[in-house]
């Protein structure tokens, strides 16, 4: 097929205990999301964590980068959809997404204690100032658990909105090596007289080297939050940090709430801005064929610090490009490579079978279609019915051909 529909155990110990609290929810096009309860010693409470695994995670052996996200309940669905859309279009790597839900949001996401008082002289946010402890929870409990019980690559992204954006900036300047990239959406840098903004300005002025990507954004938000964002963007424009990539984007047609969806889209595009394999501008064909595509992903491996395999769907596209240009033999070799690299995928067998069938070699196509339907059933592949129909059609055709020869 030319396209493919895509859709743990946790660390048990003194510090952390994960317990599955509800069934996994599989949604077409957005992988599988599990809702887990976490008992944290650092925070002294139980937290709910949502973990989204990519389509095919249960049936392959691939490892994935991880996007950690605050406000997990609010943003998991649209973020998973954004990731799936970008992955299908070859723009980013597929990701495991870990969304942490809230108990005391202000406590966890604010670096500084609040001194603001109400008319009665009482603190408006008496629990504020726990961001360092929340970051410790990420570093010592959450991330080790995820990395033990899920197949992850050594690449971490942190995304947060509003106070979560403030937390992302605080994390970057407090522990710049803890995450590889940051997405800070409408960061509340006006918090407590711009305390975190001032530290960020000093950090950006004095830091010498940091292999990190930062994407920051804001909607049409006047007042202190907008002014603080502009100050951050100004500080970013003056920095000379080696290996540091950044983008600060205003979206004047969005507000404080609606800006998140597009920010996650553009933030991931910034982090993975060179991800897409180069194509010929005239024909749209992948430049350099399979060798050129493999060379591109080798460069990405060097940039991201882990082995980045050429994606199955991209190799599949290359095969169909060749098939469409009448280069059947070359297409078959590409499809064979996909079978070698992704033997657990039903679709790779189906595609190779189709190439053989188009060339009139139904005797070679039939067992491959059979393999595709067997794997499709085993993997609960949404395209199983198509694989089965292809096998039955070619099997019947082969029997008819054999019967004719006997006459």
Region spans (language model):
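Polybasic, low-complexity, intrinsically disordered segments
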Residues: 22-26, 407
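N-terminal secretory signal peptides that target proteins for export/translocation
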Residues: 1-7
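Extended hydrophobic/Leu-rich segments
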Residues: 7, 11-12, 49
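Intrinsically disordered, low-complexity segments enriched in Ser/Pro/Gly/Ala and basic residues
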Residues: 4, 20-21, 29, 39
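Bacterial N-terminal signal peptides
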Residues: 11-22
